[in-house]
Amino acid sequence: MDHPSREKDERQRTTKPMAQRSAHCSRPSGSSSSSGVLMVGPNFRVGKKIGCGNFGELRLGKNLYTNEYVAIKLEPIKSRAPQLHLEYRFYKQLGSAGEGLPQVYYFGPCGKYNAMVLELLGPSLEDLFDLCDRTFTLKTVLMIAIQLLSRMEYVHSKNLIYRDVKPENFLIGRQGNKKEHVIHIIDFGLAKEYIDPETKKHIPYREHKSLTGTARYMSINTHLGKEQSRRDDLEALGHMFMYFLRGSLPWQGLKADTLKERYQKIGDTKRNTPIEALCENFPEEMATYLRYVRRLDFFEKPDYEYLRTLFTDLFEKKGYTFDYAYDWVGRPIPTPVGSVHVDSGASAITRESHTHRDRPSQQQPLRNQVVSSTNGELNVDDPTGAHSNAPITAHAEVEVVEEAKCCCFFKRKRKKTAQRHK
């Protein structure tokens, strides 16, 4: 399973590795066995594999000092397209002030691997979407949208564009944690600096770029080979919001002889689907959002507050209460592959940055602890599962992350659903 490679110019711009704390690895193989305990750094014990991908492996880990579970990403040092250090660099660039970002506890070598230790989060929006019979109510979508606009604004404020919007990359917090209602953004493996760190200027507009992102949600301009900027992240979010409301998008399930032709068909269908048709039977604000983001100039800074207000005003007009009572609250979450049950006291650290997020949550805790990856490029470990989340990776010139991937490793079957309207 190939993970999309970064463009050559981005690799050249990547600075040499930062000085890290010295890492300790008890055995260089990077795998566990009964003969010894594999450690990453001074205090992170490596447990069982809970996911894998071209980057390497995702392991369950434990902080022996705090007794808390963590996620550990292991990437071979000799990887053909190393990205873990770049992702770590972006996490450090984002800092710890933003709400809804996973804590990064450690990065360093571990034998033949580079290892990154991250906060363990809950299930992804895609998993929760399945749990809710593949449709969300308007209230749930608006609570998600208001939060994710703030997440993306924060990412952009740190001179980064995300370029990988998909439900698998947005996770709620862990069960029993006071921030389990917070939507987190994860996996910055495809992120890019849109402000050149040397010139401090916006990157230039370019065409004939290879596709980077997830075909189902990416912007129309990305399909056309145009360099991505802030506008493209917001358009991809809009497509994802409509996916949640409708249950599916008009460009899903298209067939073609080759992957390149398939992605071309997806892009053509997006362009030929009027916004009014895409948003039919839903509030006009959804169409207004998409019209606004699609009209943005490549260099233009989006008016995030205008877009948030668009949704908050609709939220209030509908008489909703921002109580975090999402559609999945109260539903039993199936035990995922690689799940562990932990103390309710094992808490994650998140940051509050917007006043509406300070309101107390009235939701009930989810019943089962979920071990989630912090990378959307993972397969279900169970090879017998009927639903495969493996990405279909195109040829080198088409850097596309396929439509459906799983963060929480549920054993499940994908249900065929018609469009549903709430």
UniProtKB/Swiss-Prot annotation:
Matching entries from PROSITE patterns are given as: PROTEIN_KINASE_ATP (PS00107), PROTEIN_KINASE_DOM (PS50011), PROTEIN_KINASE_ST (PS00108)
User: Might you report a single GO cellular component term?
Assistant: cytoplasm
Describe activity control: Repressed by 2-(2-hydroxyethylamino)-6-(3-chloroanilino)-9-isopropylpurine (DB08325).
Q: Where is this region: Disordered?
A: 1-36, 351-389
Residues bound to ATP are: 50-58, 73
Principal subcellular localization? cytoplasm
Question: EC class of this enzyme?
Answer: transferase
- Name the SMART domains for this protein: S_TKc
Active-site feature positions? 164 (proton acceptor)
Q: How is it modified after translation?
A: Autophosphorylated.
- What GO biological process terms does the UniProt entry carry, in alphabetical order? endocytosis; positive regulation of canonical Wnt signaling pathway; signal transduction; Wnt signaling pathway
* Cellular compartment(s): Cytoplasm
Q: Which GO terms describe its molecular function?
A: ATP binding; protein serine kinase activity; protein serine/threonine kinase activity
Matching entries from CDD domains are given as: STKc_CK1_gamma (cd14126)
Keyword Ion transport present in the record's keywords: the answer is: no
Q: Where is the composition biased (Basic and acidic residues)?
A: 1-13, 351-360
Official protein name in the record: Casein kinase I isoform gamma-1
